């Protein structure tokens, strides 16, 4: 994420990070000041903690509304393979919540990106960052208001295909 952040320097960057690093009140304050927001995961923090994501989504939506960037990876994890994992819908929930707060008057853009590492396990190896074409959510606003989940699933497919086209994707490994 830091390498991508360094490529996008024209605005404040916000990131979602594992919630467990926010447990210490001092670290919590420091991380939030740096633009990190806690992401609660079912497999790690449990169902009751996952509901705290609504506050994170609210904070991320406020950042988007204020013209900042929220960066997250839809796969919500790391892997050392050459294939694209399953995407979660949280990034679209954040984006549409921000659009809703702005009465669907401002456009929210999704910028697909992918990272290629020459050696996933070793730092200081070659890395390539690719950015795709920004995807505007504005054409989907009306459809979203009528059918939220179906619209998010449709956009998720578009974003996933855009990222898949930018990377080395080998499904049968």
Task: Annotate each PLM feature.
Residues 1-150:
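Soluble catalytic domains of membrane acyltransferases
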Residues 149-153, 157-173:
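Long, charge-rich alpha-helical interaction segments
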